[in-house]
UniProtKB/Swiss-Prot annotation:
Subcellular location field: Cell membrane
Function: Produces ATP from ADP in the presence of a proton gradient across the membrane. The alpha chain is a regulatory subunit.
Site entry: Required for activity: 377
Residues that hold ATP according to the record: 176-183
Description of how the protein assembles with itself and partners: F-type ATPases have 2 components, CF(1) - the catalytic core - and CF(0) - the membrane proton channel. CF(1) has five subunits: alpha(3), beta(3), gamma(1), delta(1), epsilon(1). CF(0) has four main subunits: a, b, b' and c.
Keyword check for Transcription regulation: no
Enzymatic reactions: ATP + H2O + 4 H(+)(in) = ADP + phosphate + 5 H(+)(out)
Main location as per UniProt: membrane
Protein's name in the database: ATP synthase subunit alpha
Annotated Gene Ontology cellular component terms: plasma membrane; proton-transporting ATP synthase complex
InterPro entries recorded: ATP_synth_asu-like_sf, ATP_synth_asu_C, ATP_synth_asu_C_sf, ATP_synth_F1_a_nt-bd_dom, ATP_synth_F1_asu, ATPase_a/bsu_AS, ATPase_F1/V1/A1_a/bsu_N, ATPase_F1/V1/A1_a/bsu_N_sf
Record's bilayer topology term: Peripheral membrane protein
Sorted UniProt keywords: ATP synthesis, ATP-binding, Cell membrane, CF(1), Hydrogen ion transport, Ion transport, Membrane, Nucleotide-binding, Translocase, Transport
């Protein structure tokens, strides 16, 4: 039988006390006075600051803490949006302020993963290994730290790379009605970044879970997940999580822009982020604002809905060499209703971004895919974001397509056209056919240049309009197999100010003539 001695009691006391932190701590504690619809009204948190995280500690029936963000600071109460399920939070529950703002894990460990807006993995591949966290909200880089956009982001889509080029550090809006191929353009761009030294982030806001799973499956199929991070806030998530999702994705992108990650043994400091889509993001923020009883404005959106998107998109930048030379390129997506680009959210985002890719339902239904309306689409960075080779061949293309649009409109009302006008219209139709491209089949820059050179130098004038896409596919297959040296020559000289150099011109024209001599498309 063991006897309890004074020495044993002393040891027990020592053991218990040594495991307890007896230092005094000041904690700002309050209580929940009302909760519902993802919003909690709190009393007693007199030291909380705007956007601070508040914690609802574990209690009977709830083993984990639930967190929220304090957004409305009123005279006698604080309103906080709850990040997660609010069903276990009740009136009278304790709540504490944490002194922190919301942060997410960033860095190497996120590559190839699917996470929620809090940076927690949802792909079943285990915990994420990370070394640091970053606040999701941050002031955009200043004017002094930036550099002008001069390096292209090759989308692999010939119509975009030739007519509406996107540069590293640019914000290019993808806008159009539902089911016009907006996500397809973004996913094609991500797939084309393989081997280009670019990390991609895809932020899904308010989408169906099946749709997000389909996107992830597509990226895995084409080997793009190894350099991609997917941030998912689906339609089943709370409006609060949908609201913070793009900011979380942007913080992950900023880490890459500033400090870089290792990709295939190289340090990569260029990131591309897709926000799909900001229309649903604005709706989620409207829901949060109305629940917080903020006064509604136009279309019931709160007064700061412009600032909601401007502070997000301004964080995309190209840094100068003194600050690391990294870049964050943003491709926000906006869904319009019945082609109405003059609605509130579309006009807001158009005015914030550096151009827009406008996809039209009528063109999509007519078989023009990508359904790019060249007339309304624009890139404010322009040819500064193109290689010299693409600039040389695309310059003529823009003018000829503009001329074709004018003549096509005129031809609708004219019964008899002269031969020159007919030839110009047919030429425009050929060029338009050339810009059609199947999904998930991005073209390398040397292939785009070769095809556009042939088109703008009258080598396609004897090919029937219906055979143009077949001609393009066969010609590129011929170049890859019979003349890979021509493709290499174009790629090696793509930055030459005098493109096409006599050497490139001679080799390319010889290859085109050889192909025309061995094929028949009449």
């Amino acid at each position: 039988m063991t006897t309890i001695t004074e020495e044993l009691i002393a040891r027990l006391k020592q053991g218990i006390i040594s495991g307890v932190d007896l230092q005094p701590r000041q904690v700002n504690v309050g209580t929940v006075i009302a909760v519902g619809d993802g919003v909690a009204r709190l009393s007693g948190l007199d030291q909380v600051v705007a956007s601070e995280i508040v914690e609802f500690p574990p209690k009977a029936g709830r083993n984990e803490s639930i967190y929220g963000i304090a957004l409305n600071l009123e005279q006698d109460s604080v309103a906080a949006i709850i990040l997660g399920d609010d069903e276990s939070i009740e009136e009278g529950d304790l709540v504490t302020s944490t002194g922190r703002v919301i942060s997410v894990p960033v860095g190497q460990g996120l590559l190839g993963r699917v996470v929620n807006p809090l940076g927690q993995p949802i792909d079943g591949k285990g915990p994420i290994q990370y070394e640091k966290m970053r606040p999701i909200e941050r002031i955009a880089p200043g004017v002094i730290t930036r550099k002008s956009v001069d390096t292209p982001v090759q989308t692999g889509i010939i119509a975009i790379d030739a007519l509406i080029p996107i540069g590293r550090g640019q914000r290019e809006l993808i806008i159009g009605d539902r089911q016009t191929g907006k996500t397809a353009v973004a996913i094609d761009t991500i797939i084309n970044q393989k081997g280009q030294g670019m990390v991609c982030i895809y932020v899904a806001i308010g989408q169906r879970r099946a749709q997000v799973a389909q996107v992830v499956g597509t990226l895995e199929k084409y080997g793009a997940m190894e350099y991609t991070i997917v941030v998912s806030a689906t339609a089943s998530e709370s409006a609060a999580l949908q609201y913070i999702a793009p900011y979380a994705g942007c913080a992950m992108g900023e880490e890459i822009m500033e400090n870089g990650v290792m990709l295939n043994g190289q340090l990569v400091k260029d990131a591309l982020i897709v926000y799909d889509d900001l229309s649903k993001h604005a709706v989620a923020y409207r829901q949060v604002s109305l629940l917080l009883r903020r006064p509604p404005g136009r279309e019931a959106y709160p007064g700061d809905v412009f600032y909601l998107h401007s502070r997000l998109l301004e964080r995309a930048a190209r840094l100068n060499e003194e600050y690391g030379g990294g870049s964050l390129t943003a491709l926000p997506v906006i869904e319009t209703q019945a082609n109405d680009v003059s609605a509130y959210i579309p006009t807001n985002v158009i005015s914030i971004t550096d151009g827009q890719i406008y996809l039209e339902a009528d063109l999509f239904n007519a078989g023009q895919r990508p359904a790019l309306n060249v007339g309304i689409s624009v890139s404010r960075v322009g040819s500064a974001a193109q290689t010299r080779a693409m600039r040389a061949v695309a310059g003529k293309l823009k003018g000829e397509l503009a001329q074709f649009r004018d003549l096509a409109a005129f031809a609708q009302f004219a019964s008899d056209l002269d031969a020159t006008t007919k030839a110009q219209i047919e030429r425009g139709q050929r060029l338009q056919e050339l810009l059609k491209q199947p999904q998930f089949q991005p073209l390398a820059v040397e292939d785009q240049v070769a095809v556009l050179y042939a088109a703008t130098n009258n080598y396609l004038d004897d090919v029937p309009v219906a055979m143009i896409t077949k001609w393009r596919d066969d010609f590129l297959a011929f170049l890859r197999t019979a003349h890979p040296e021509v493709r290499k020559l174009i790629y090696d000289n793509r930055l030459d100010r005098k493109f096409p150099t006599p050497e490139v011109k001679e080799a390319l024209e010889a290859a085109i003539k050889e192909f025309k001599a061995t094929s028949n498309y009449s």
